[in-house]
Amino acid sequence: MLGHDLVSHVRSAMLNKLRGLPVPESHPVLSQLRAGVFVTVESIVRSGGYERREVRGSLGIVEPFKDLAFDSAKVAAKLALSIPRFTEFDLRRSVIEVTLVEGLREWGGDLGSFEWGREGVYVIAGNKKLVVLPQTMIERRLLGPALLRYIESMVGAPERMYKFATRIFYELRPEGEVIERELWKSRVIRQYLEVVR
């Protein structure tokens, strides 16, 4: 239920922003919750008889500013305007993914205690900041030492690193059923864990 409410709220915020209408900043359930939130928009691309998803844009905050209804609507509205040539028509043909971020805590880079598929990373290096969500780790095969190499290649030597827990809610089809992604069950992570054990 939370996933459906959250994705529906985000989609409404994006649609209203694209139409020039006020963005819904409250919700009976979401206004009671506090969490960081990332919103991702993926277009459905059909080519050669296959269908794939292509990220159009992603934006978020690692710590809550206000409540989840307010924060998710503001992030979604800003994202809708930041995607080049993004229209109502594009939104109707796109799937929405919302990642909740909770429990931000310092992390020394210990890979042995890292919960692959459940945790993400927030890194600060000077004026550079980087967020790596669990889905990015799987898509780019950033498991084990590859994650630390990726961080260094993106921001240089990190001054501070944090990890956080996530819950990922995802539309199966545009405006369709919403599921909670269980990335820790992915084949990529299982194969990695078999090798390191």
UniProtKB/Swiss-Prot annotation:
* All copies of domain AMMECR1, residue ranges: 1-190
Q: Which Gene3D superfamilies match?
A: Hypothetical protein ph0010, domain 1 (3.30.700.20), Hypothetical protein ph0010, domain 2 (3.30.1490.150)
The lineage's top-level taxon is Archaea
Show the Pfam families listed in the entry: AMMECR1 (PF01871)
What protein am I looking at? Protein PAE0830
Naturally occurring in which organism (per UniProt) = Pyrobaculum aerophilum (strain ATCC 51768 / DSM 7523 / JCM 9630 / CIP 104966 / NBRC 100827 / IM2)
Q: Which lineage is the organism of this entry classified under, starting from the top rank?
A: Archaea, Thermoproteota, Thermoprotei, Thermoproteales, Thermoproteaceae
